[in-house]
Amino acid sequence: MKRRIKIGEIKMGKKKDKTKERYKNLTLLHSNDLHGDFLAEKINKDLVGGVSMLSGYINKVRNEEQNVIYAISGDMFRGSVIDSEYKGISTIEIMNLLGPDVATIGNHEVDYGIAHLLFIEKCATFPIINANMYIATNGNRLFRPYKIIKINGMKIMFIGLITEMVLARTKLESMIGPFIDINDAVEEVGKVCNAYKPDDVDLTVLLTHIGFEEDRVLASKLKPEWGINMIIGGHTHTFLDEPEVVNGIPIVQAGIGTSQIGRFDLIIDTKKIK
């Protein structure tokens, strides 16, 4: 029986087989709102999606391209009986096998409680980042705010952000909830970016879970000197055939589940995307 996965690809620029040392190719794959979508769905006579097909495509790209990064923009949890039964532990083990290079949290990552989420974060073999979730009493972040991935001499920085909707869920936790706060996303991006000189990183990506319209608002408020190159979003399950550009910043989402994946094919020239 044939198995296939619908792959939605977003490409920027043309790939070149040979590039000078100044120019380097980078393939950036991204998913969001997987929601425990592990199994393929039968459509007509074909099986579409499923984590095994998604993994197969990612591995295929890793074998074909020299520099590949795979990022997940929140809501890995919820949506399946298996995920609910094991409260995300089974899901994070499957995500470990899928092998993302970086992920941020979504609102459904807190469905099983903040303490449980912190345990899940320790179970992950990949970095889970968030810059704007804080402990209200001492001002400490709950997660590392960013991750710089070094690949073939390039430094790619990801900054994680989450929607304020998560507060509605955390406030239900009588013991921990009142001590959790969500800071302004723009302010947190500025804090991270101001800590780096422009030459410190080659590409800066916001990995958000705040929704497409909020991504547009966020992009409009970002200062040019912060050097944000793109926003990879989630939360609203938005399908985009082409990036939405606001304030010179491309914004993308890859819908929902495992039946599609976003893809950027980039040529990096120090600070510029060609």
Predicted ranges, named:
Residues 2-274:
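Acidic, metal/ion-coordinating pockets
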